[in-house]
A protein has these predicted regions:
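Cell wall/extracellular polymer interaction/catalysis modules
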Residues: 25-208, 216-254
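Bacterial N-terminal signal peptides
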Residues: 10-20
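A conserved hydrophobic position in a structured secondary element of the catalytic/binding core
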Residues: 213
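N-terminal secretory signal peptides that target proteins for export/translocation
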Residues: 1-5
Length: 254
């Protein structure tokens, strides 16, 4: 991929300190008190591609659900542990590129993308109006793996064209970055370009690893997420949610 003078961006858009850590991260880790917005996605089990999502806001130490639960789809093969904010243990199975699973765990929310420039004024998230020079690099052999790139030239090589962000696809008319495998640096082959986006066939189809939701839901998320509130997305199977809820400082769900 030819990249001279291109603008290269990591996915990560850091809102501030999003986690609390000590030398014993497994025992002490929890969502930071500064995280005031939370989206929780829960699947029945590790192999399910269907989830229920809920939005929460926090005042003081209490979480309050915002709006009604809504449905989503994830990887066709279900979930697998991703690389986000939560600590990792030696027995975790990692997500890998092309495995058909969505990353589970806790993740920051990053920049958003869309086809309509008008959304820049309607969201508080950093917003990119997508054009033909915008790439999301999913090639594990590239030094730009799991990064957003804006070329200073129209795509020329087969590699550049393959990494182009989708154009004129209603499923990708709006999307929001889920910060999987971004910090401290992306690890090659551990999964890339994980996003919220619009679902296909009215929710009848799973994804390759992203979280897909309805048109109405993606617009709600675009208008609701506020970087000042350090939003986080937690995606887990129910068994892991119940096991980690109190330790991670997560809300009760019905």
């Amino acid at each position: 991929m030819r990249i001279p003078r291109s603008r290269v961006f990591g996915f990560t858009f850091v809102f501030g300190l999003a986690v609390l850590m000590s030398s014993n991260v497994e025992a002490s880790w929890k969502l930071a008190d500064s995280t005031k917005q939370l989206v929780v996605g829960v699947a029945p089990d590790w192999n399910s591609s269907s989830i229920v999502l809920r939005r929460f806001e926090r005042s003081g130490k209490s979480w309050r659900q915002v709006g009604e639960p809504f449905n989503g789809r994830v990887g066709a093969k279900g979930l697998v542990w991703g690389r986000g904010l939560n600590p990792r243990t030696s027995d975790m199975t990692d997500k890998s590129e092309g495995d058909g699973r969505a990353p589970a765990g806790a993740f920051r929310i990053g920049r958003s993308f869309g086809y309509e420039g008008s959304w820049k004024a309607k969201t508080k998230l950093p917003y990119v109006t997508v054009g033909p020079r915008d790439l999301l690099v999913e090639d594990p052999t590239s030094p730009l793996y799991n990064k957003y790139v804006r070329l200073d030239h129209d795509p020329e090589t087969a590699s550049e064209k393959k990494q182009q962000m989708k154009q004129d696809d209603p499923t990708h008319r709006l999307k929001i970055t889920i910060e999987h495998n971004t910090t401290p640096v992306p690890i090659a082959g551990k999964g890339s370009a994980i996003l919220f986006h619009v679902w296909r066939a009215g929710g009848a189809k799973p994804t390759a690893g992203c979280t897909s939701v309805s048109d109405a839901a993606i617009e709600t998320l675009m208008g609701w997420f506020d970087p000042a509130k350090e939003p986080v997305y937690v995606l887990l199977p129910m068994s892991e949610y119940e096991a980690n809820r109190a330790r991670w400082n997560l809300p009760l769900i019905g």
